[in-house]
A protein has these predicted regions:
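Gram-negative/organellar outer-membrane beta-barrel architecture
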Residues: 1-125, 208-218, 226-234, 291-315
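Outer-membrane beta-barrel strand-turn architecture
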Residues: 6-8, 34-36, 85-89, 132-134, ...
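Transmembrane beta-barrel strands of outer-membrane/channel proteins
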Residues: 16-20, 42-50, 56-60, 95-101, ...
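Outer-membrane beta-barrel proteins
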Residues: 25-27, 51-55, 102-108, 135-137, ...
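Solvent-exposed, glycine/polar-rich loop segments of beta-barrel outer-membrane systems
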Residues: 114-115, 120, 201-213, 259, ...
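C-terminal outer-membrane beta-barrel translocator/porin domains of Gram-negative envelope proteins
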Residues: 121-129, 133-245, 252
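A short pocket-lining beta-strand/turn micro-motif at the edge of beta-sheets
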Residues: 234, 246-250, 275-279, 288-292, ...
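C-terminal hydrophobic structural anchor segments
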Residues: 239-275
């Protein structure tokens, strides 16, 4: 990690995070802060990983397989330029452009091209944010709100099937200490695609824990990484956190979700009993390198159990 103030201008800050290894990642941020006037930012981020993903994320015509999961090499390089200002002295309001390179391939499939996505995407986006949490990872008080709408306007279209579409999403959370050392946290979020045909690789994909979110890949207790997918979703997360002694936490979480394609078309497909649920019990410690956590989770639907370790800040 490297951070430098006044790199080019007297009111700017630049930061670079890099991880080398099997899954190379970096995150570069540059921001010129003009206070209540319009500020300028640039972000460049590379994410790579190799995982088994649910075949629901993919087009069966691409894979020609009935397998439930496929091993995939994931490459995402995103570059954003944006403007941001302060609205009503509380909310961050802004928008910008993003150029993304997305490549997915699998060597495990037979009789088909191993590269099933290799496209560039240009999108415009707008956002509104607010955050008053006293801490990022183990908040005791405050609330936050994030919303974004993004329109994909252009693609180099590797598979010759691109049509313009948009994705809207929002999340809200609140934390409150109910008595000494016990904090309850409530979080809800949702999103949906707008358009005749969206790209399945930008669907909402749930599962796993302890990673920085990329595109619309999101955590969900009780299910393995990249297990649930759809172009729309709604999710609820409830957490009880007890600080057993300073900077050491025990917590219990329950999350519920409905995920599918166009679930908001009718109220009967989303405002109903959740199709997916999961629970977790864990221990976390606040350190100078970020949170160190162990979580054990399970789901009553699948009867599967997963244990995750997370060390340091997520990026």
């Amino acid at each position: 990690n490297y951070t430098k103030k006044r790199l080019i201008a007297k009111n700017d800050v630049a930061s670079l995070d890099v991880i080398l290894g099997d899954n190379i990642r970096y995150n570069f941020d540059y921001y010129i802060d003009n206070g209540f006037y319009w500020s300028f930012g640039f972000n460049s981020k590379l994410t790579t990983f190799n995982r088994n993903i649910t075949s629901n994320i993919t087009d069966d015509a691409v894979f020609n397989t009935t397998a439930n999961a496929i091993n995939v090499d994931f490459f995402d390089l995103s570059n954003q330029a944006y403007l941001q200002t302060i609205f009503a002295q509380k909310f961050s309001l802004g928008g910008g452009l993003e150029f993304k390179v997305l490549k997915l391939e699998s060597e495990t499939l037979e009789n088909t091209d191993p590269v099933f996505e290799n496209s560039d995407y240009l999108s415009v986006f707008g956002f509104v944010k607010y955050d008053s949490f006293d801490k990022k990872y183990f908040p005791r008080t405050g609330w936050n709100f994030n919303s974004e709408i993004r329109s994909y306007l252009y693609s180099s279209d590797y598979k010759s099937n691109f049509e313009r579409f948009s994705v809207a999403k929002a999340d809200f959370g609140v934390a409150q200490t109910v008595f000494k050392n016990m904090t309850l946290k409530f979080q809800t979020e949702g999103g949906f695609a707008v358009g005749e045909r969206s790209i399945s690789y930008f669907d909402f994909i749930l599962g796993g824990y302890g990673f920085q979110q990329v595109n619309n890949i999101k955590p969900f207790f009780g299910y393995d990484f990249l297990s649930i997918a759809g172009d729309s979703y709604v999710k609820l997360l409830l957490t009880a956190d007890y600080e057993i002694f300073k900077k050491h936490h025990l917590n219990f979480s329950a999350n519920f979700a409905n995920v599918g394609n166009k679930i908001f078309d009718t109220i009967d497909t989303w405002f109903v009993q959740p199709n997916y649920s999961g629970y977790s019990f864990g221990y976390g410690m606040e350190t100078v390198i970020g949170p160190v956590e162990i979580k054990h989770s399970w789901s009553p639907e699948t009867k599967d159990h997963h244990t995750w370790f997370s060390v340091g800040f997520w990026f």
